[in-house]
Amino acid sequence: MSKTNKSKSGSRSSRSRSASRSRSRSFSKSRSRSRSVSRSRKRRLSSRSRSRSYSPAHNRERNHPRVYQNRDFRGHNRGYRRPYYFRGRNRGFYPWGQYNRGGYGNYRSNWQNYRQAYSPRRGRSRSRSPKRRSPSPRSRSHSRNSDKSSSDRSRRSSSSRSSSNHSRVESSKRKSTKEKKSSSKDSRPSQAAGDNQGDEAKEQTFSGGTSQDIKGSESSKPWPDATTYGAGSASRASVSDLSPRERSPALKSPLQSVVVRRRSPRPSPVPKPSPPLSNASQMGSSMSGGAGYQSGAHQGQFDHGSGSLSPSKKSPVGKSPPATGSAYGSSQKEESAASGGAAYSKRYLEEQKTENGKDKEQKQTNADKEKLKEKGGFSDADVKMKSDPFAPKTDSEKPFRGSQSPKRYKLRDDFEKKMADFHKEELDEHDKDKSKGRKEPEFDDEPKFMSKVIAGASKNQEEEKSGKWESLHTGKEKQRKAEEMEDEPFTERSRKEERGGSKRSESGHRGFVPEKNFRVTAYKAVQEKSSSPPPRKTSESRDKLGSKGDFSSGKSSFSITREAQVNVRMDSFDEDLARPSGLLAQERKLCRDLVHSNKKEQEFRSIFQHIQSAQSQRSPSELFAQHIVTIVHHVKEHHFGSSGMTLHERFTKYLKRGNEQEAAKNKKSPEIHRRIDISPSTFRKHGLTHEELKSPREPGYKAEGKYKDDPVDLRLDIERRKKHKERDLKRGKSRESVDSRDSSHSRERSTEKTEKTHKGSKKQKKHRRARDRSRSSSSSSQSSHSYKAEEYPEEAEEREESTSGFDKSRLGTKDFVGPNERGGRARGTFQFRARGRGWGRGNYSGNNNNNSNNDFQKRSREEEWDPEYTPKSKKYYLHDDREGEGSDKWMGRGRGRGAFPRGRGRFMFRKSSTSPKWAHDKFSGEEGEIEDDESGTENREEKDSLQPSAE
């Protein structure tokens, strides 16, 4: 039903928005009301729409203290309160200027314009559903009455719009206020139309069941249809337990149930949007117990609303004057819906019977019918509803009519008469109680409905109640005793449903007297209807209530009990009915007392019983689980001795172990020195020995311990280079020995390079090494590494390079290179190589030409892990490419690269930058290659001489 309501209230919401706005404005019963609604809503919506539609928001609805009202984000640092209107960019000093001044529309730049929804200024009070709050402060401030009526109207429309429980509650509140007003208004026009119809209007407005009374007298014949339909729709809406009265308007409630929201005040703002849907949804929800109750309550509202709204649509026959028609169209609807609604009712009853088709429900339906007879005409629709969900309408209707129809009609006629008098009293008391009722608006929802219907119904019904309740009592008691055992678990659920239903119907019934009665009646009807267990509970509560009704302790009983109580209390509730709020307040108290006393009785009895039943219910699965758990614990205790170690100790042990291992690794690791001491001299000192010695040790160890520790550490690269350079040195040496590879590299770099590399590869290698070393030495003490490397033959150099020590020297010389090109490239060469590969190959040809022999030999190594040298480059692509290609690219790119080289590459930068050759080669390119080859050879020779001296 909520979906139906939502769809309906979707259409209705637009309609209701326009209707409740326009209706509030144009149609509204009281223009002040509608204007306040429309003003409050206009402000809300206009602020919303304005904020959304670029209207100047600077002073839009200053809802919040200006402290928080950052004037639409004029500038947070300027202080919210400053009259500095946010100057967006592109605007001069025009606070909310025209388009060019940046003040277009919202006068704020777009990026800040639309944060108003979130701005403290709006304080989120303008939520997507702006100020739909039931006591909307604005509406309240405008006028209390206007709040109740027009604000209720706006809220009702908003509730139609949102069709949320909250809105429904609000809508019921509005309806209750509207029903009060419209019952006063409508009952006045109705009384003008005829006292009976005025009462009908009142009762339809107030108790929807008035239409039942009206129909009892006016449409006794349609009423059976209406009762049939009412039973069907009541069963569908299961909330309209008043349905003969309430349901007569709601007979079309399938369609109208959603519409009911605007039930009394609004003739047909949302004429029955989708009867089957609303019935189906109502039926489904009523089937679902609490949901059913809620839907029933909403149907009650909607049925009234539909009765009033959709009578024009569904049953244009205007039995009741259209003025009262909003609430009284329910009579028309009853008539037309008696026939049309009977089909719905039958269909829905059959559906419900299929869904909830339980003979038990039929039994309860009979009992409920009897009880509902006693309860009042509305009760028989309620009974029908109760029985109908489970029994076909005809089945439930037949016993219903047979047992209840005469009495029901009698009750209806009496009820009409009494309701006419009662409504007159109510109108008087309504004015009296309005002050009271406003004070107690929280009780508006239920008490009014219950009081109104119950007052009349209790007058008629109390006479018959004692006997009927007793009979119902006995029948229900039997049923209940039979079902009591089953009801135990359900009673709790039913109570919950009842509570939820009562809450919903309290809120939802506000403008819905039948709902009040329904709540009392439909409470159980819905619960019975929603599930056979809830009906059991309903029967239980009705038995209890029956006894209570006999005691006329209406508080602790359903509306029947209330009606029993009505003589004592319902008269006050008649007054309360007359004045919506006071009536609602007192009646809500009564409802609370009744609901809670019933609930309490049920709860206390059924809670304890339910606890037992719950335990028994729990036993199969819960006890089994408990049993398994017990077994597990037992087995663990007896068969698996605990180590006596706590989890903390256990995990601490692991942590300690890990820490010890880490400490040992750190102690062992010379990488710490490398990490800490990155100076080339340190590398030189540690380099050959440590790196060479460590290269086997460090690779795994370092790789695991240190590399893990410092992922950016060059040690990873160094390690891999060491490993790969050692391998590569072997390969590289063979390659080194082969200048052709160097030449191939140089070919890659340049054919000139290759030629030059071949020509003076060894000499140039030495010179380049010397140069590289001298550069690196000039750049840093790494030249000593270079010198060492130079001291060694190229192969030795390559070995050194391949060795971690040489790698270190290379690191020193070509900082990035050392780490990068530990693969056994000559340091100087590798400097250039690292540069040279990227550079040497293409950019750094100069050094490559000079280095080409060394670089090529090294590059043979380089190749090996060069990207060029696929095996290594692929294998260690990350490190090798980063090292070799990365370093070379990095060097070649101008130190751009070298995540790894950077650690040592920094030195390289210094060294390489210090080395004129490096800088020159870096930019020399192929041209520079030749120059570098010549000048580089000279420089390298010089540097080689310098390096030996330095070393």
Swiss-Prot record:
GO MF annotation, one: nuclear thyroid hormone receptor binding
Primary localization class, coarse: nucleus
Localization of this protein: Nucleus; Nucleus, Nucleoplasm; Nucleus speckle
Residue ranges, compositional bias (Pro residues): 266-276
Biased composition (Basic and acidic residues): 58-75, 144-155, 167-188, 347-387, 411-449, 460-483, 490-518, 537-547, 660-677, 688-758, 877-891
Cross-link (Glycyl lysine isopeptide (Lys-Gly) (interchain with G-Cter in SUMO2)): 202, 215, 221, 252, 333, 346, 353, 375, 384, 386, 393, 398, 418, 424, 448, 452, 459, 465, 468, 476, 481, 524, 548, 555, 599, 694, 702, 706, 708, 753, 756, 872, 875
Residue positions, PTM N6-methyllysine: K252
In-chain residues carrying the UniProt-annotated modification Phosphoserine: 220, 233, 238, 240, 243, 248, 253, 257, 315, 320, 326, 339, 379, 403, 405, 466, 532, 557, 559, 572, 616, 619, 669, 679, 681, 695, 860, 924, 935
Compositionally biased intervals (Polar residues): 204-220
Region annotated Required for mRNA splicing activation, chain positions: 2-190
In-chain residues carrying the UniProt-annotated modification Phosphotyrosine: Y328
Modified residues (Dimethylated arginine): R17
Regions of compositional bias (Acidic residues) in chain numbering: 926-936
Family (UniProt): Belongs to the BCLAF1/THRAP3 family.
Subunit and partners: Associated with the large multiprotein complex TRAP (Mediator complex-like). Interacts with SFPQ; the interaction is dependent on SFPQ phosphorylation at 'Thr-687' and inhibits binding of SFPQ to an ESS1 exonic splicing silencer element-containing RNA. Interacts with NXF1. Component of the SNARP complex which consists at least of SNIP1, SNW1, THRAP3, BCLAF1 and PNN. Associated with spliced mRNP complexes. Interacts with HELZ2 and PPARG. Interacts with CLOCK and BMAL1. Component of a MACOM-like complex, named WTAP complex, composed of WTAP, ZC3H13, CBLL1, KIAA1429, RBM15, BCLAF1 and THRAP3.
The protein, known as: Thyroid hormone receptor-associated protein 3
Gene: Thrap3
